[in-house]
Amino acid sequence: MFSKAFLSAALLGAAAVEGHMMMAQPVPYGKDTLNNSPLAADGSDFPCKLRSNTYQVTEENTAAIGQSMPLSFIGSAVHGGGSCQVSLTTDREPTKDSKWIVIKSIEGGCPANVDGNLSGGPTSTGASKFTYTIPEGIEPGKYTLAWTWFNRIGNREMYMNCAPLTVTGSSSKRDEVPKEKTVEKRSANFPPMFVANVNGCTTKEGVDIRFPNPGSIVEYAGDKSNLAAEGSQACTGTPTFGGDGNTAGSSGSSGSSSGSSSGGSSSSAAGSGATAPPAPAVSSTLVPKPSQSSAPGVFVPTGSPAQPTHTSAPSGGSSSGSGSSSGSNSGSSSGSSSSSSSSSSSGALTGSCSSEGTWNCIGGSSFQRCANGQWTAVQQMATGTECTAGQASNLKIKATNLKPRMLHEMRHRKRNYHNHA
């Protein structure tokens, strides 16, 4: 009798000649020249499967903030599913240096929850259909959307299709596609996109990976038994590029932070012990600024620190953990950092803080924030900007004088941006 693994491998081999998968909706850039193969293993066509006329706009996709939009695929070689992300950049012709922010992660069952491949060949539309939503905190403007996929079975690959997207302001109730079935909402934040299998960091075969920084919206569409163990590494090796999204936040992924549960990550039938993977450490809202005043791909911090909200957990077996949550937050606002905070020689603060929402600008070139009772990791200011040093309730940002070479590069990028917008 053949094993399940053998049958899965046989199905994958039989479908190898049928190609792989492509994004159908939103309509990708250069649809006529896009093929269904993964990115090159050496990363030479990252991002967006670089080729001739990569960023030709076949059809401009439009989405309003808060509107649920379809995410669908064409093809049958789903390689046992896997995990996917939906990300945005303000660059309309992204490069390896572009900054991507994650607006949704799908851990397991993407693009389909099967053991091998689907039938139907490269024109099949039988893969699962998902949705994504442009969240609050994203400004109206022109973006590039990326769908990335890390397959569970087969060669270690990364798939990436990109699409032009115009984001409009939110509106009243409208016709929307159905909402996600099992979605985990976390503190509002937009972490960097995960990159692997093209940069020296390799994912493990046979599991649906958990993303180190999955972001605010996480959907679980696969079998719990296929999901990687909580706290496990998503990939091994040192990434040569795109490694910003490959490291978990300082809160870690062990589930030991306040408000997490020890034990399993599924909810019990009785409703107690429901737990969720931990939220990333940096919880201040990051807002993309696609305006002409800043270079494409720059994201400027703004808004108030968001509080984590757990609305659901992966479906499956009962949880072995207690599911207890301290639920406590520091409510005091003294205007200065807590005495338990420690300061480094660079001016960065670590540890707990009581001045919730306070910004700490370090030498004008980097910043951090008191969020959820802890100082966040230090982040660098965007090129061409600086902040006013010290602690304050608002982060004061101003433009700086740029070197002629930097100004030339920014103007060149802006010209390209508007020519293709």
Curated annotation (Swiss-Prot):
List where Polar residues composition bias occurs. 304-314
Q: Listed GO molecular functions?
A: metal ion binding; monooxygenase activity
Bias kind Low complexity: ranges: 247-285, 315-349
Q: Where is this region: Disordered?
A: 231-349
Q: Which UniProt keywords apply?
A: Carbohydrate metabolism, Chitin degradation, Disulfide bond, Glycoprotein, Metal-binding, Monooxygenase, Oxidoreductase, Polysaccharide degradation, Signal, Zinc
Q: Which family does it belong to?
A: Belongs to the polysaccharide monooxygenase AA11 family.
Q: What is the recorded function of this protein according to its Swiss-Prot or TrEMBL entry?
A: Lytic polysaccharide monooxygenase (LPMO) that depolymerizes chitin via the oxidation of scissile beta-(1-4)-glycosidic bonds, yielding C1 or C4 oxidation products. Catalysis by LPMOs requires the reduction of the active-site copper from Cu(II) to Cu(I) by a reducing agent and H(2)O(2) or O(2) as a cosubstrate. Active on chitin but has no activity on other substrates, including diverse mannans, cellulose and starch (data not shown). Primary chain cleavage yields predominantly aldonic acid oligosaccharides with even-numbered degrees of polymerization.
Its recorded name reads AA11 family lytic polysaccharide monooxygenase
Q: Which organism's genome codes for this protein?
A: Aspergillus oryzae (strain ATCC 42149 / RIB 40)
What broad taxonomic lineage does this protein's source fall under?
Eukaryota, Fungi, Dikarya, Ascomycota, Pezizomycotina
